[in-house]
Swiss-Prot record:
Catalytic residues as annotated in Swiss-Prot or TrEMBL: 78 (nucleophile), 174 (charge relay system), 176 (charge relay system)
One cellular component (GO) term of this entry: glutaminase complex
Membership in a protein family: Belongs to the glutaminase PdxT/SNO family.
HAMAP family: PdxT
Name used for this protein in its record: Pyridoxal 5'-phosphate synthase subunit PdxT
Superkingdom per UniProt: Bacteria
Catalysis: reaction(s): aldehydo-D-ribose 5-phosphate + D-glyceraldehyde 3-phosphate + L-glutamine = pyridoxal 5'-phosphate + L-glutamate + phosphate + 3 H2O + H(+); L-glutamine + H2O = L-glutamate + NH4(+)
Subunit relationships: In the presence of PdxS, forms a dodecamer of heterodimers. Only shows activity in the heterodimer.
Residues reported in the UniProt entry to bind L-glutamine: 46-48, 108, 137-138
Role according to the record: Catalyzes the hydrolysis of glutamine to glutamate and ammonia as part of the biosynthesis of pyridoxal 5'-phosphate. The resulting ammonia molecule is channeled to the active site of PdxS.
EC numbers on record: 4.3.3.6, 3.5.1.2
Keyword Hydrolase on entry: yes
Lineage: Bacteria, Bacillati, Chloroflexota, Chloroflexia, Herpetosiphonales
Length: 190
């Protein structure tokens, strides 16, 4: 199995390092011809408007949507989660492309600016009893989930920060910045 990591902007190298530590082959995806070579795709954190525009510029938006329709597992972290969302709480920036694959409403920068970034331990039942140490950097949150979406983790105040819909996975935080590979293992099992 080869896992693609969208490598247009953002924390793609950290995802590759985590996957390679699990013995999984990776490929940086920048072009449609690279997308056809992978069985799964991670869309990393970064800046969602920039990544969305680059998806269009490099002719990847529709091919990713098509691969998702064919059942390819896709995981979006932070900005990647925003790109997966069907809806954005405060609306999309004018002209902002998005994949719109997952029946969630995401809210950008839900916790504030860069200075408000934080780390916390989350209870994630699908990962077992041990808490998952999550890193939130200018993180979004999920305001609303559709009927087919399973909430995987919430903060103590109830804000949803991880969800799954079929073979789509979304995390508001950055599992690739921790030494804990459990979310990567979960994704590999989708």
């Amino acid at each position: 199995m080869t896992v693609g990591v969208l490598a247009l902007q953002g924390a793609f190298i950290e995802h590759e390092t985590m996957l390679q530590g699990l013995g999984v082959a990776t490929l940086q995806v920048r072009l449609p011809e690279q997308l056809v070579q992978v069985e799964r795709l991670i869309i990393p954190g970064g800046e969602s408007t920039t990544i969305g525009k680059l998806l269009v510029r490099f002719d990847l938006l529709e091919p990713i949507q098509q691969r998702a329709a064919e059942g390819m597992p896709i995981w979006g972290t932070c900005a990647g989660m925003i790109l997966l969302a069907k809806e954005i709480a405060e609306g999309r920036v004018e002209g902002q492309p998005a994949l719109g694959l997952m029946d969630i409403t995401a809210r950008r920068n839900a916790f504030g600016r860069q200075v408000d970034s934080f780390e916390t331990n989350l209870q994630v039942p699908v990962l077992g009893e041990a808490p998952f140490h999550a890193v939130f950097i200018r993180a979004p949150q999920i305001d609303k989930v559709g009927e087919a979406v399973e909430t995987l983790a919430s903060l103590d105040d109830g804000r949803i920060v991880a969800a799954r819909q079929g073979k789509l996975l979304a995390t508001a935080f950055h599992p690739e910045l921790t030494g804990d590979a459990r979310f990567h293992e979960l994704f590999l099992g989708l």
